[in-house]
Design a protein with these regions (language model features):
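Short solvent-exposed beta->alpha transition segments
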Residues: 62-107
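Exposed beta-sheet edge and beta->alpha loop/turn motif
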Residues: 105-152
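Short, low-complexity N-terminal intrinsically disordered segments enriched in polar/charged residues
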Residues: 17-57
Length: 152
């Protein structure tokens, strides 16, 4: 009996332990598209659309120094884009257009991340495009990813 009481006291002592407070990071904020500068919106949309339309036409116009950062220009080569386009075209068909989903502002880096839904001929697989625009109105990252379909 004595052991049970001691065990219960120890259990009570550990169960009353104070909880750690979770710190919420306010540096990344969801922003309304109207609140973003039009030049940033247009830059993200135009470069994303130009990249995806090159999959339809097989002609890619390289990004300029005033449009994208050096890292993006080095990674966006004709060879890399053509191999990615072949995979995407096989799975999804021709590129039709972009639809803006949301805009996220990273306050620490002062960047805007634009997320677009990519519309293709085949509706079997959904893809998203994310374009990151810096404070200098240059694209610092472009990425596409396949979105898992939600079960019914």
């Amino acid at each position: 009996m004595r052991k049970i009481i001691i065990l219960c006291c120890i259990a009570l002592l550990f169960s009353c332990k104070s909880k750690k407070h979770v710190v919420v990071d306010k540096s990344i904020v969801l922003v309304k598209p109207e609140a973003v500068e039009p030049i940033k919106q247009n830059r993200a949309y135009d470069l994303g659309k130009r990249l995806l339309e090159s999959c339809n036409t097989s002609r890619f116009k390289a990004f300029g120094a005033n449009e994208a950062t050096e890292k993006v220009r080095q990674n966006a080569t004709k060879d890399k884009i053509s191999t990615i386009c072949k995979k995407i075209n096989q799975r999804n068909g021709r590129f039709l257009g972009l639809t803006l989903l949301d805009v996220v502002h990273n306050k620490t880096k002062n960047e805007y991340i634009f997320r677009y839904s990519i519309n293709y001929e085949k509706k079997l697989f959904k893809r998203e495009l994310s374009v990151t625009v810096t404070a200098d109105n240059k694209v610092s990252a472009i990425a596409t990813k396949e979105v898992a379909s939600k079960p019914l």
